[in-house]
Amino acid sequence: MNEENIDGTNGCSKVRTGTQNEAALLALMEKTGYNMVQENGQRKFGGPPPGWEGPPPPRGCEVFVGKIPRDMYEDELVPVFERAGKIYEFRLMMEFSGENRGYAFVMYTTKEEAQLAIRILNNYEIRPGKFIGVCVSLDNCRLFIGAIPKEKKKEEILDEMKKVTEGVVDVIVYPSATDKTKNRGFAFVEYESHRAAAMARRKLIPGTFQLWGHTIQVDWADPEKEVDEETMQRVKVLYVRNLMISTTEETIKAEFNKFKPGAVERVKKLRDYAFVHFFNREDAVAAMSVMNGKCIDGASIEVTLAKPVNKENTWRQHLNGQISPNSENLIVFANKEESHPKTLGKLPTLPARLNGQHSPSPPEVERCTYPFYPGTKLTPISMYSLKSNHFNSAVMHLDYYCNKNNWAPPEYYLYSTTSQDGKVLLVYKIVIPAIANGSQSYFMPDKLCTTLEDAKELAAQFTLLHLDRERNLFSLDLCRRIWRK
């Protein structure tokens, strides 16, 4: 190492040589007893630490660190992160030049230490005017595989994935809501490591790879949000999936009351899953053990504890498009005045522009267009074979949402009024026939528009938001990245 670097200790801006860098790292190793090796573009400090016995820490113990000054190294970083707890391994990503790449991964020995690091070191001023970002690191080992023939069984999918990719550990397949003999057209494949999953994803490039003669969809599976153990210890609501569409809330309540009459407070069923609320946690945990794997109306059910999330913070993230689609088994506890909880799933990212100027400006058009060369091969497809992120319009999102749930298209009814200054103001009422007999017979926003396009777009946005908040109905594309144990 012969490059020069800035020594930022105590906020200094003193140039230090490569020899000084090496001396500082050697001093750190001598002081801590940790080893340090550099391989594959990263420098590993520890892993395991001296005297460590047993397996590595479980998932959830590692944090990601971003916005690290490029001339800052382990001798400065390790003492900062040791404030949160014992470091199992510190991995600093390195450039060939000897500078770091601006980010690192820190694995602690416990999840509690990792959570503490996030709380005390996120947005920490590591140098004057330089703030680092710290968040949980998810070592993703699962892939979403879509467009799978619905008649294929778990064993067939597992065997096929083992043939075409390496390191397959398990396959998660959910039965169709309407026909339990078929799957939902997608599966989650778990690999032995993140590297194995990444290699499989690279091999299964959409459009170039087929299974059983079908072009499949491949993407990373987004793991559920982690809920801290202390919060989970207070949960007294069970999440029940794989129910028959025809199964009623009364039937579910009766089945869960069998092991202890009167234990169930109420049941909220949504399509093929439900939330079962108990008066106390002990009964909920006991019922989970008894009922998991049992049959109700001929369907083998899965029962887990529902995962609570913070209502206010979650909705703020949700409306900003920052929350992952963890849908069904996330439950937002309502205020005490409210009689029912609200379930939560991810809304499509919708256009915020409702000013009558729907035509993109020239720069916007340029960003979303590509040259169409003569002789380019075109393939006819259905819009419903696309992903939801291909749509910028809430109207298209709503149509797509209904189709994915096997509903009839939404019906739009136009109404008008006149403002005090003589303007004609418009509003659409939307009826979704498939759920029109439920608690919500139609959807109509509380604002009026001056153009047809804006009125229709606003009504569709309002309907999507309301569906998501009040019903959280299953949608394949919106839920395609969810995985559960």
Swiss-Prot record:
PROSITE patterns: RRM. Signal peptide: none annotated. One of its GO terms (biological process) is female meiotic nuclear division. It is found in: Cytoplasm. Coiled coil: none annotated. Gene3D superfamilies: 3.30.70.330. It comes from the Eukaryota. Keywords: Cytoplasm, Differentiation, Meiosis, Oogenesis, Repeat, RNA-binding, Spermatogenesis. GO terms for molecular function: RNA binding. Residues 61-139, 141-223, 236-308 form the RRM domain. Pfam families: DND1_DSRM, RRM_1. One of its GO terms (cellular component) is cytoplasm. Essential for male and female fertility, playing a crucial role in regulating germ cell development by ensuring the proper progression of meiosis prophase I. Regulates mitotic-to-meiotic transition in spermatogenesis by forming a complex with MEIOC and YTHDC2 which recognizes and down-regulates mitotic transcripts for a successful meiotic entry. Required for normal synaptonemal complex formation during meiosis, binding meiotic cohesin subunit mRNAs containing GCCUAU/GUUCGA motifs in their 3'UTRs regions and positively regulating their translation. Interacts with YTHDC2, MEIOC, MOV10, CNOT6L, DDX4, UPF1 and PABPC1. This is Probable RNA-binding protein 46. The lineage of its organism: Eukaryota, Metazoa, Chordata, Craniata, Vertebrata. The gene is RBM46.
